[in-house]
Amino acid sequence: MGIKERNAPSQYKQSSRKNKRAWRKNIDLEDIESGLEQTRDEEIKGGNVEHKPNDALFVIDTLGDDRIAKRSRKKIKPLKVDQILENKSSIEKVHSHLTNNSTESNKKGKIFSRKELNRLQALVYKNKDGLTATSAASELKNTKQPKESYDVWETNPTVTIPVKRPSTLSKLPESLTENNAKVPNVVIADPGMSYNPDAAAWMKLLDTKGSEELKKEQKRISELEEKERIQKKAFEDKGLVSDQDVNHSIDSDDQSEHEQAETPIPSSKNKRKTRSQRNKIRQRREEELRLLEQKKNEELLRTIDKAPAISKKLQQKDKAEKFSNKAVSSSTTEIKLKKKKFGKHRLPNNPLEIKLGDELTSSLRELKPEGNLFADRYLSLQQRAMVPPSLPVLKKSKYRAKIKEKYSHKDFHLQKNSI
């Protein structure tokens, strides 16, 4: 076999640098990358310094350097001789009092006696009337009022505290009624509450009070049903059965012994609506809104046509209200409260004071009174925000009740045998 020829190793081919693609590929980006890295570091450290305001970069120093203050406060070290001669005793020395008889001080002329000083001041500050400053001052001193004296040994000193008028007395109480209507002190009762009422007034009052009581009863029943439903749901979630369900199931088993047919149980989960169903619901809603708007516009056009007649009726009504009896109007109107709560508790409702058909009497001798005048006055005070509503407080014992075993427990066996 012949020897194979070995070619030279292939050299690195440099890519052509004539087109723009090669320029982008082989360009040097070290400066740009270093700049981006620098901006990244500045953002990590708190942001670019050039774009920050002066308040974020500089602070006005109002305290100063503590080291300079300490250096200025530092005392000059005294000499050793002065330190030895310094008085280090904690007891003060006895000062010598200067007297008026001291000849040296008088000779030097530095210290005057009190009498000499008063004489010189009188010569200098002499008034036209002849009064001196010292005499005027002494007169003022004598005219001062003497201090009040009191007995130190008094056992029960009488201290008089001045009574302060509260600021709330000058303010009106908060109005609890709608439109800040004034609540009368004594509300006149409805004509239907009379012992011998008019038939129409009595029937009207009976209808209003009966509808109110019916609403209260319906509300109470609905709350009770909702409570039972929640309780039943809680039992079902836990996998238990309530007592009512057990009794109901026993009764239903007794009744359905002869019935074999089973009704399918509908699924409680709501099915997802399709797009067409949602579109139909939306279109129906839009159509209802359009019809409602059209109806409102038609009614508005009708009222515009009847505007003169309506204005005439309103004027007649205003005239009738002006000439009507104020007492009757105030008695028939019922007080409407805008706030049902004043303080911690709710305002109590007006008591139901009405006679039924079998309770109506034609004479005062057979009349059974309804309500209480004291309770009515107190309720009026609460409605006028003069007295806050409260609940009756039960009387509590001062001491806690203790459970104690009686001595008769030892005769338990005897009682058991006797039984």
Curated annotation (Swiss-Prot):
Gene Ontology biological process terms from the UniProt entry: ribosomal large subunit assembly; rRNA processing
UniProt KW Transcription keyword: no
Compositional bias segments (type: Basic and acidic residues): 233-261
Top-rank taxon, per record: Eukaryota
Pfam families reported for this sequence: Nop53
Phosphoserine, modified sites: 242, 249, 252, 256
Positions of disulphide bridges: none
Region spans: Disordered: 1-21, 233-283
Main localization category: nucleus
GO molecular function terms listed in the Swiss-Prot or TrEMBL record: 5S rRNA binding
Cellular component GO terms held in the UniProt record: nucleolus; nucleoplasm
Ranges annotated as biased composition (Basic residues): 269-283
UniProt keyword annotations, A-Z: Nucleus, Phosphoprotein, Ribosome biogenesis
Subcellular location: Nucleus, Nucleolus; Nucleus, Nucleoplasm
Record-linked InterPro entries: Nop53/GLTSCR2 (IPR011687)
Functional note: May play a role in ribosome biogenesis.
Membership in a protein family: Belongs to the NOP53 family.
Protein name as catalogued: Ribosome biogenesis protein NOP53
